[in-house]
Amino acid sequence: MATTKHLALAILVLLSIGMTTSARTLLGYGPGGGGGGGGGGEGGGGGYGGSGYGSGSGYGEGGGSGGAAGGGYGRGGGGGGGGGEGGGSGSGYGSGQGSGYGAGVGGAGGYGSGGGGGGGQGGGAGGYGQGSGYGSGYGSGAGGAHGGGYGSGGGGGGGGGQGGGSGSGSGSGYGSGSGGGNGHH
């Protein structure tokens, strides 16, 4: 009787682990690869042209034109780093370095690089810079939610500023923004 209970318990534990891993991979947090849905490229993270999270080191690229989030090129961070995203919305956490370039037709394009934590975003919706390092972003959006301008994130633990769009900087560090205001709504 005890053996049957132990066997049933072991099966339940294995099923729980399997479902948790699948869910994490689908959400893009998992350590595995995976083309769409989860993290792109190797090692899980990867940047995307659209929105998404990248954890771990990796490389991924996504294109697309006319979307709300511009396509382009994104690269994950070094060790556990998030990485900046070119056109889309998203955030990067952890330490490492990530950079991305994206130009979206109909979306918000621009250039965003994140060092250490998140990094700034070019033309997308906001951007977080968390962790240690340096993040900067340059973006110009045609018809996007946020306009162009230049914003540089903070040093250690610093947030990030955005030139044209809406953004906030928290923690210690330095954030500055210069450039145009909001884009065309």
UniProtKB/Swiss-Prot annotation:
Coiled-coil boundaries:
none
Entry keyword Repeat: yes
The chain's disulfide connectivity reads none
Which positions carry the signal peptide feature in this UniProt record?
Answer: 1-27
The subcellular localization recorded is: Secreted, Cell wall
Highest taxon of the source?
Eukaryota
> Does this entry carry the keyword Signal?
yes
Region Disordered: what ranges? 149-185
> Can you quote a single GO CC term?
extracellular region
Record's note on what induces expression: By infection with rice yellow stunt virus.
Q: Which UniProt keywords apply?
A: Cell wall, Cell wall biogenesis/degradation, Repeat, Secreted, Signal
BP GO annotations: cell wall organization
Q: What does this protein do?
A: Responsible for plasticity of the cell wall.
Concerning PANTHER family, the annotation shows:
GLYCINE-RICH CELL WALL STRUCTURAL PROTEIN 2
Name the UniProt record assigns to this protein: Glycine-rich cell wall structural protein 2
Q: To which species is this protein native?
A: Oryza sativa subsp. indica
